[in-house]
Regions:
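Hydrophobic/aromatic beta-strand elements that line small-molecule binding cavities or substrate pockets
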Residues: 1-3, 48-54, 64, 81-90, ...
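Hydrophobic ligand-binding cavity/cleft-lining segments
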Residues: 1-37
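Disordered, low-complexity segments in secreted/periplasmic proteins that are enriched in proline
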Residues: 72-75, 146-159
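A short, structured loop/turn motif at beta-sheet edges
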Residues: 6-10, 52-59, 87-97
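Sec-exported extracytoplasmic/periplasmic mature domains
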Residues: 14-27, 57, 90, 131-142
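Short, solvent-exposed secondary-structure boundary/capping segments
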Residues: 58-67
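Beta-strand/loop substructures that line and gate deep hydrophobic ligand-binding cavities in soluble
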Residues: 70-128, 135
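Hydrophobic pocket/interface hotspot
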Residues: 11-16, 22, 52, 62, ...
């Protein structure tokens, strides 16, 4: 998933690229570093027990650990290899695009319909996140968050 931003990539990354900036643009109550140091390999954030596993000047990648997923919201679930990468990619000297890549295995879900629903939910959640990042990176203010369960298109709570 990606979105164009009318700001240089370095400025975009400075505004939305810290590991716990996720709380603002994904609209979750809080994010704290629970282990390690913010921005360093191995840092763990309170959001889904996610671990920083790779980074460049304008990107980072993270994973959810099997132990978190084993005790995750809604009870134990099979490990799905979930990884995410957020990148600010330069397009011109004054514009960029934010690219969010998710990698996961949802083959353990009951059937094709359940797998397609899972993918659609993730796309909706992270498309909304990208739209929020664009607003913030371009100097705007996010509109009020929809109420939880706010209907179609409402951002789902973090994993």
């Amino acid at each position: 998933m990606e979105i164009s931003v009318n700001k240089p990539a370095a400025e975009v990354w400075k505004r939305v690229g810290k590991f716990c900036d996720i709380a603002e643009w994904l609209r979750i109550p809080t994010c704290t570093i629970t282990a390690g140091k913010d921005g360093e390999f191995g840092a763990v954030r309170s959001v889904a027990g996610e671990v920083l596993v790779a980074k460049t000047e304008l990107s980072y990648s993270y994973t959810q650990t099997p132990s978190f997923q084993a005790g995750g919201r809604g009870g134990p679930r099979p490990y799905n290899l979930y990884h995410g990468t957020l990148e600010a990619r330069p397009v011109t000297p004054t514009t960029s695009k934010l690219v969010y890549t998710l990698f996961f295995d949802n083959s353990m879900l009951a059937d094709d319909m359940a797998r397609e629903r899972d993918i659609a939910q993730k796309k909706a959640q992270f498309t909304t996140a990208l739209e929020n990042m664009k607003i913030l990176a371009e100097g705007g203010t996010l509109p009020p968050a929809p109420a939880r369960g706010g209907g179609p298109g409402a951002a789902a709570p973090a994993r």
